[in-house]
Amino acid sequence: MSIPKAKKYISDFEQLGFGMFVHWGLYSQLGRGEWVCFMENMNMPDYEKLMNTFTAEDFDAEKLVLTAKNAGCKYITLTTRHHEGFSLYDTCGLSDFDAPHSPAKRDLIREYVDACSKHGIVPFFYHTTLDWHTPLFKNDFDAYLEYLRKSVEVLCKNYGKIGGLWFDGNWSKPEGTDWKEDELYKTIRKYQPEAIIVNNTGLGARGRVGNPEIDSVTFEQGRPTPMDREGMEKYLAAEMCQTVNDHWGIGSRDINYKSPKELIENLCLCRKVGANYLLNIGPGAQGAVDPYQSALFGLIGRWMELYGEAIYNGRPYAAGSSGNNFMLKSVDGKYLYIFVFDLGAIGNANVTVGGKYSGSIAFGNVKDEIKGIEWMDNGKKLEFVQSNDMLCMNATGYEYGSSLGVRVARAALV
């Protein structure tokens, strides 16, 4: 069996590599996560009152987009409507439960799309399929699905070309429920024929293949596994989405943040199997970007300044090594990118605490002939020996004053 060729818009999505997820809504005012309405069994009329204090006065779409861009993100996926049912966009009469009817009196998605366009970032729209707000979801599901379809139609018609739509919530009803996905996706293709369509399969079904119109499978809060595309009718991309702490929407008492090193490792290990990495940020009550979360993205950006070429242009390569070490091959076939984890540091034993090793690293199944290897961060040449399919490389440690979590070398091919 053969592997189907990727459609261009899907391969373009894969090349984006790294994106920012943004969860922001009425729930952000409470600071207890995006599921607070459900988890605390809140009365919906009381929850709706949060709309009366939603001013979005701190929301600066351009600042948000620049935070993503400076981190090396090529796209952003923003919650246009989450499970609470409140829309950040003008629903054009479908509902009064939206940002233009709040004290904000603004179409926040318009501002977001405009800022993305200005700074060369591809805008994606998250949209819930589950809705705790409208009674239609429980009482007249067919009518609800038409409301959902019309809502998505508004997003597809009114904001120019978008990168894609990221749906979430089909896991909320029993297996076999008819969500009328064909009709929903047909509407998208009518207005956005090259939009990436994602429908999150949730924590319990990572990587599951769904409707034929789906373009990418999801790995929520878990590192992706290699995709077996042999015999597939259509080439599918893959994407891991992850929080920087334990909540998607802001949790004001959640300080369990992942380290920059862990986030960088996850980005790299996503690219090892050809998956994108979608890392979340949760703005504050009125849209301000949290300084600590912004700083985390900033540190990733400093790493991406050195190694972004490998993240964007590298594709999975079958060479094997010890630990997490791996290789990617450039799209143009001119380079191998060698990712080295847990590298030690060069320094005085009285002050330097190294990683697991520095020295010789072996790779097997290296089918390409190499003419030279250098660290991408400083251009220093590395000694290596290649024999048949084996490569042994002397991975020199970090110079004192430098420690980058994952270090990448570039090997020029003959």
Language model features with spans:
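Mature catalytic domains of secreted/periplasmic carbohydrate-active enzymes
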Residues: 1-414
